[in-house]
Amino acid sequence: MYKIFFRLVFKRMDPERAHYAAFRWIRLAARIPVLRTFVAAALAPRHKELRTEALGLRMHGPFGLAAGFDKNAIAIDGMAMLGFDHVEIGTVTGEPQPGNPKKRLFRLVADRALINRMGFNNEGSAAVAARLAARNPVFRTTVGVNIGKTKVVPEDEAAADYVKSTERLAAHADYLVVNVSSPNTPGLRNLQATESLRPLLTAVREAADRTVTTRRVPLLVKIAPDLADEDVDAVADLAVELGLDGVIATNTTVAREGLGLKSHPDLVGEAGGLSGAPLKDRSLEVLSRLYARVGDRITLVGVGGVENAEDAWQRILAGATLVQGYSAFIYEGPAYARAIHQGLAARLAASPYATLAEAVGAETRKQAAA
C-alpha cells in the first residue's frame, strides 16, 4: 500500500516537502490517543527475545531511528509508535542555523538511496533542550541526542561549541553522540583525526559529567565510511583509551565510484552525503573492523544501508549491539521497523544462539579464528 502511495504521490513531490508532509502526519497520529494506540499495536509489537541491554540501558529491541529524520525532537513519540526502539534526534548544533540553500535533498530511487547536503538545519541546542525538558512521553523509548558543530564556528573553537550543546542537552539525553562525520559542514570531518578528536571528546565527556551528576550519560562518536582502515583503527583505539561508551558506524559517504549506482549521472553528481543501499557493504566492513579491534569493550551501533531484517542481522553478527536505519524508511514506509524486528526474531529463533547478545559479533569472531 505504502509503495503504491510512494510511487503516486511522494515520488512526484520535492523530497524535502515530502519529508515534512510525512513528518506532520506521524506527529498528528501520535497526538490522537485512539489512533496512536491502534498504530502502535499494529506496528510496534514487542518480541521478548529481542530485549536488548546496551549503554547501561534496557530497550525492547535493537533497532532504532538514525539521526537526521527528527532534527528538533518533535516526533519522538510518533517514531516510537512506528516501532523504533530508540530514536536518535539531531543533529543539533550549539546555535540555531537554517542549513544549506535548497534544493538540498535528492532521491536516487533506482539505487534506493538519498543524497543530502542539508547542513545541520536545526533550531539550536537551547530550543531543543527546552522541548525535551517539557516533553511528556506517551511511549517508553530511548532517546539519543546527536550533536554537531555550528557552521560559523571555526574549527579551533569547535570543542567549546560542542560543550555548549552538551551542557544544555546532556540532562535530557539517554545517550549523547558526537557527530564529526557529516560531509556537509566545512571542516567537520577534519575533527575525526585523533589529534583533534581526543581533546574534543575529552571536553564533551567532562561537560556531560559536570552537568549531570546523578548518572553517567553514555557518550558515543559517529564516524564516516570514508575513513581509511588505519584511521578506523585509530578511532577504535581512541574510543577505548578515553572510555567512550560506543561508536556509530557509519554516517553518509562522499564517494560515488565503485558503488554501482544506476541513477542519472546528474543526480549522482549532486554534492552531499549519500546514504541508503549503496552504502551497505562499506558500512558493514567498517563495523566488522571496529569489532575486531574493540570486541565487547564498547557498544557498536551499525547504520548505513540497512534495508531489511537480513541487513540488520548481518550488522549484529558483525558486532553491532544496536542497529539503526533512516533512508530505507523513506522507501519502505511505516511498517519498516516492524518488519525488521519480526525478521530478527525469526532469524534468532533459527540460529544457534540462545540470545541476541550471544549473536553480537559472532561472524567477526569466527572470521578472526579461521
UniProtKB/Swiss-Prot annotation:
Listed Pfam families: DHO_dh
Catalysed reaction equations from the record: (S)-dihydroorotate + a quinone = orotate + a quinol
GO molecular function, one term: dihydroorotate dehydrogenase (quinone) activity
Active site: S182 (nucleophile)
SUPFAM superfamilies to which the protein is assigned, alphabetical: FMN-linked oxidoreductases (SSF51395)
PROSITE patterns from the UniProt entry: DHODEHASE_2 (PS00912)
Gene3D superfamilies: Aldolase class I
Principal location class: membrane
Cofactor(s) needed by this chain: FMN
HAMAP family on file: DHO_dh_type2
Role, per record: Catalyzes the conversion of dihydroorotate to orotate with quinone as electron acceptor.
Name assigned to this protein: Dihydroorotate dehydrogenase (quinone)
Protein source organism: Streptomyces griseus subsp. griseus (strain JCM 4626 / CBS 651.72 / NBRC 13350 / KCC S-0626 / ISP 5235)
